[in-house]
C-alpha cells in the first residue's frame, strides 16, 4: 500500500511538472536583496495563495536589519509578550473568515474561533456574553468582579509561562541571561522528558488498564509539566532574571537561561518529579543541557540540547540506560551530578575567598583529560575486556598526578582535598 501511494504521488508530481513546470521548479517569490523577513526568510505575501484567501503578509521596511520582519513573525513576538503576562484566556465563536494581515490568530479565525490572552482590565473591557473565560495558573472558578461588572469563569488552565523581565518590564534578551550567569557569560539550553513513556502507557497499568486510568495518568503528567514547572522556576529565580521556560507540557520541557541556573533547574525538576511520583522506580526523567555564547541561535541551541538528551537516554552503565543527565556532552547519573554540583559550590567558595587559585580548576580539568585519554587508548585494545580496562585505568599516571597536585594545595584545605581524592578515585568519578 505504501509503495502504491508513493507511486501515485510521484505520478501526480510528474504530470504537473510536464503540464506546468513553473509550479514545480519556480521561480517563486520576487527575490531582491532586502525584501525578506530576517526571522523566517519569507518574502512579502508568501506563500502563494494568500491573496486568494483575503490575506497579506507584508514585510516591514526598516533601517535596521533586525527589525525587518513579516507580519506573522511580528505577531509571534506580540504573542510571547502576552503569554508572559497572561491572566485569562478568552475563547469566542465567530463566523469563519480570512482577511487582513497574516498573524498567529488568523488560522483560528479561519476555523471560527477567536482567542484573546488578557489581563483583568482587558477582560472587563472586551468581554461579551457567550465568551468562554479560562483563568490562567490559578485553579479557581470564582467570577471576576469589578466596576459593577461580573464576568463568569468557566474553567482554569495551567500555562507554563515563566519569563525573565528587565526593570522596564520588557522580556530579557539572551545576552542579558548570559551576562547574568555565574562565572563565564554563557547561556544554557535544557531539554528533559520522561523515560519509557510509551511503555508506561502500554504496560504500566497492567491488568488494571482502563480508559479512565489512562486519562488520569496522562493528566497527572501534564499537571506536573504544565502546572508545577512555573513554581519550580519561581523558587529558583525569584527575581525573574535568569530562567526562560519556553515549553513545558505533556512529558517534556525546554528552557533556556543563565547556564548555572539551567543546571540547577534540571536537578530540581528531577528531584520534584521523584517526589511527585512517590519515588516510583519505573517513573524516571532524563535531561541534557548545552552551553552557548550569547549570539548562538536559539533554535540551534535547542537542537544541541535535544541531541544531548538522546545521548543521556542511550548512555549505558551497570547494564541500564536512561534516568541520566548529559552535562555539556558528559553523561552522568543523577547522583554523580549532585555530587559534582556540591563540589562545584565548595570550590567556588574557595576561589571567592582566595584559598585556591584559578589554576587549581585547570589542573583538575587536565587530570580529567589525562584520565579520558588513557581510557580511550586502552579501550581500543582488543585483548582487554571492559572490566580489565576499568581496572588498569584506575592505576595510570593521572592518579599520582592528582595526589601530587592536591598535596601541594592550601594546608587548611587538606582534609577536604583528601576527601575529594578518595571520592574521585574510590568511587570512580573522574570524568
Regions found by a protein language model. Name each.
Residues 1-431:
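Charged, helix-rich terminal subdomains or tails
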Amino acid at each position: 500500500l505504501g509503495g502504491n501511494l508513493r507511486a501515485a504521488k510521484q505520478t501526480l508530481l510528474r504530470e504537473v511538472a510536464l503540464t506546468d513546470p513553473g509550479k514545480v521548479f519556480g521561480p517563486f517569490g520576487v527575490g531582491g536583496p532586502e525584501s525578506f523577513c530576517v526571522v523566517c526568510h519569507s518574502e512579502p505575501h508568501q506563500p502563494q495563495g494568500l491573496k486568494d484567501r483575503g490575506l497579506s503578509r507584508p514585510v516591514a521596511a526598516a533601517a535596521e536589519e533586525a527589525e525587518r520582519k513579516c507580519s506573522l513573525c511580528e505577531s509571534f513576538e506580540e504573542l510571547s509578550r502576552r503569554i508572559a503576562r497572561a491572566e485569562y484566556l478568552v475563547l469566542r465563536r465567530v463566523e469563519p473568515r480570512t482577511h487582513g494581515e497574516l498573524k498567529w490568530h488568523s488560522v483560528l479565525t479561519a476555523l471560527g474561533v477567536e482567542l484573546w490572552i488578557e489581563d483583568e482590565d482587558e477582560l472587563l473591557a472586551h468581554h461579551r456574553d457567550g465568551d468562554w473565560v479560562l483563568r490562567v495558573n490559578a485553579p479557581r472558578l470564582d467570577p471576576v468582579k469589578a466596576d459593577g461588572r461580573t464576568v463568569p469563569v468557566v474553567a482554569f488552565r495551567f500555562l507554563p509561562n515563566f519569563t525573565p523581565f528587565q526593570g522596564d518590564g520588557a522580556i530579557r534578551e539572551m545576552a542579558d541571561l548570559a551576562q547574568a550567569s555565574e562565572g563565564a557569560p554563557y547561556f544554557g539550553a535544557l531539554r528533559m522528558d520522561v523515560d519509557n513513556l510509551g511503555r508506561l502507557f502500554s504496560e504500566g497499568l497492567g491488568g488494571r488498564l482502563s480508559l479512565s486510568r489512562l486519562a488520569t495518568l496522562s493528566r497527572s503528567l501534564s499537571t506536573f509539566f504544565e502546572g508545577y514547572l512555573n513554581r519550580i522556576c519561581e523558587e529558583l529565580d525569584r527575581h525573574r532574571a535568569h530562567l526562560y521556560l519556553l515549553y513545558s507540557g505533556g512529558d517534556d520541557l525546554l528552557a533556556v537561561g543563565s547556564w548555572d541556573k539551567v543546571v540547577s533547574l534540571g536537578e530540581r525538576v528531577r528531584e520534584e518529579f521523584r517526589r511527585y511520583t512517590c519515588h516510583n522506580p519505573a517513573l524516571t526523567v532524563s535531561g541534557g543541557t548545552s552551553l552557548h555564547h550569547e549570539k548562538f541561535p536559539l533554535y540551534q541551541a535547542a537542537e544541541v540540547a535535544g541531541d544531548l538528551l538522546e545521548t543521556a537516554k542511550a548512555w549505558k552503565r551497570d547494564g541500564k540506560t536512561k534516568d541520566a543527565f548529559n552535562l555539556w556532552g558528559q553523561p552522568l547519573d543523577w547522583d554523580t551530578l549532585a555530587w559534582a554540583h556540591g563540589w562545584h559550590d565548595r570550590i567556588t567558595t574557595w576561589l571567592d575567598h582566595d584559598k585556591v587559585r584559578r589554576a587549581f580548576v585547570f589542573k583538575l580539568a587536565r587530570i580529567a583529560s589525562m584520565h579520558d585519554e588513557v581510557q580511550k587508548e586502552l579501550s581500543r585494545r582488543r585483548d582487554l575486556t571492559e572490566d580489565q580496562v576499568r581496572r588498569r585505568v584506575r592505576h595510570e599516571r593521572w592518579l599520582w598526578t592528582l595526589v601530587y597536585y592536591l598535596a601541594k594545595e592550601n594546608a587548611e584545605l587538606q582534609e577536604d582535598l583528601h576527601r575529594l581524592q578518595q571520592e574521585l578515585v574510590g568511587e570512580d568519578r573522574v570524568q
